Regions:
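Glycine-rich phosphate-binding loop and adjoining beta1-alpha1-beta2 segment
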Residues: 376-412
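Structural motif
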Residues: 346, 439-440, 462
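Compact alpha/beta protein-protein interaction domains typified by the UBC
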Residues: 22-91, 99-103
Length: 492
């Protein structure tokens, strides 16, 4: 590997070879690489960046997504193709030639300046606003789409569930995940009945919402830069809401409105989608006791014109933004959804061993919404190398362990269990139940008795009897009628 002092000389020489660039702060060693500051004068635009080069260059930064040289300036957050940390987002072709790749990346930066700084190009895909979130803490609220029924200036209460409250890493960084449950106007998030039931067993709190309709952008700033101070946000909020918030913060909001000494306010606005638009929501945290609003008494003349006794002014304090993510079903399974004929079916899986547990997980990851699993057996150590269970599941029934796993994968799954063999039931009654409630049966029991039962009942559901032969030499899938007779062709 090249000596570090020689690498610094090489980097400086390459930068100086482009007359549009000027080194403002000399290239120097840092942990894991090299850094400096450069200025670029290009097409009449004058910009400056911190430049960071990994010591492995021309290889990429370790643990990064194809990033090699970083050009960074937080003042440019809000412009197109700028990451949350202020770095320019582009992915250069991989090249093992140091000089050639370095000069190419300088050209890529120029291309970004032309397209996104000067021409202010807008990409087809919507770019979410980047907010300055609270340091040393991570809060994220998850939600689903609604039916676009909110009106500008509408405000009220919403409910959310504290899904997890954990500490991460050696520094024990607090990581909190929340799921929105719905609004006080009976608009509910579209989680499955099973998942919503579990959410309601958690610590549930109330927050406030305000529908802005338009993005909360800083005015007279190049690009789409998010508002960062309360007095700027005041231009988007009605006096009625500020009065509601002022009185609530003084006395009306009880402990049910605070989690970890913070009140949650979500602000909603329209963003485009492939059909028309949808509502996006951003999270703001208000610390208990924080003095955000001042009430000013109006003169008599002002009272008549404004029909109010007070006007409410927000302070210039920095907004404490959390983060949010829309995980609506359409997004959650956007890249891996199975055909709707499968996902919309009511499915019964008989047998939750190696085959049944794996099939169940594949179906759930593919977007299946309604599932019943059946198995009478418990989990033993020898099951773990073949089936989708872990050490904590041992001793317990297979259905219990599998349901726990499946529910941890999808918030859109309704799942039920049967902990007994199918021969436990009266077959005539079982047939009536299956014909009414089940569309597809996957028999993964590898039990000939199960094919006897299915043949006897002759259910209307589509039936697939699956098995793996001894020593895992073959996978067998039998469907249709006369399952027992067909199975004998393979196993006798």
């Amino acid at each position: 590997m090249e000596d570090k002092s020689n690498t610094i000389k090489r980097i400086s020489t390459l930068i100086n070879s482009d007359t549009d660039f000027k080194i403002l702060k000399d290239i120097h060693n840092i942990s894991g690489g090299f850094s400096g500051e450069v200025e670029i004068n290009y097409l009449g635009a004058n910009l400056s960046f911190q430049i960071i080069i990994p010591e492995q260059y021309p290889l990429t930064h370790p643990n990064s997504d194809n990033i090699s040289i970083t050009f960074k300036n937080e003042d440019y957050i809000g412009l197109g193709h700028i990451n949350p940390d202020g770095s320019v987002c582009f992915h250069p072709d991989k090249d093992d030639d140091f000089n050639r790749k370095f000069l190419y990346e300088l050209k890529c930066l120029k291309q970004w300046i032309k397209e996104y700084y000067i021409l202010e190009k807008e990409d087809d895909n919507y770019t979410y606003l980047i907010h300055k979130t609270e340091k040393g803490k991570f809060d994220r609220l998850y939600f689903t789409n609604m039916k676009n029924e909110f009106k500008q200036g509408e405000f009220g209460q919403f409910d959310y569930s504290v899904f997890s409250n954990e500490k991460f890493g050696d520094d024990k960084i607090p990581v909190n995940k929340y799921f929105r449950l719905g609004f006080d106007n009976e608009k509910q998030d579209k989680w499955s009945e099973s998942f919503a039931k579990d959410l309601n067993k958690n610590n549930c709190k109330k927050g406030l919402y305000y529908y802005l309709e338009e993005e909360p952008l800083r005015k007279s700033i190049k690009g789409r830069k998010s508002i960062e101070n309360w007095n700027e946000l005041g231009d988007y909020l009605s006096n009625d809401f500020l009065e509601f918030l002022y009185k609530g913060l003084k006395s009306n909001f009880g402990n049910n409105f605070f989690f970890d000494k913070s009140l949650f306010l979500i602000v909603g606005y329209k963003i485009p989608n492939e059909h028309s638009y949808e509502e996006h929501w951003d999270l703001i945290k208000i610390n208990k006791g924080e003095k955000l609003i001042e009430a000013k008494k109006l003169s008599k003349a002002e009272r008549k014109s404004q029909n109010n006794y007070f006007t409410y002014c927000l302070s210039n304090q920095e907004i404490k933004w959390g983060s949010t993510e829309n995980i609506d079903y359409s997004r959650f399974f956007g890249r891996g959804k199975l055909h709707s004929k499968i996902t919309d079916s009511n499915i019964l899986i008989v047998g939750c061993g190696a085959l049944g547990s794996s099939l169940a997980e594949i179906l759930v990851r593919g977007g299946v919404k309604n599932l019943v699993i059946e198995d009478f057996d418990s989990i033993k150590g020898g099951n773990l190398c073949r089936a989708n269970y872990d050490l904590n599941d041992m001793i317990y029934p297979k259905t219990i362990g599998l349901i726990k796993r499946l529910k941890s994968i999808s918030p859109f799954l309704n799942v039920k269990q049967l902990n007994v063999k199918m021969n436990h039931f009266d077959l005539e009654k079982l047939k009536v139940f299956i014909d009414k409630n089940v569309d597809v049966i996957f028999d993964c029991s590898t039990d000939p008795e199960m094919t006897f039962i299915l043949d006897e009942m002759d259910v209307s559901a589509d039936v697939f009897s699956m098995a793996i032969t001894n020593n895992a030499k073959s996978f067998i899938n039998i469907t249709g009628k006369d399952l027992t007779k067909k199975a004998k062709l393979f196993f006798d």
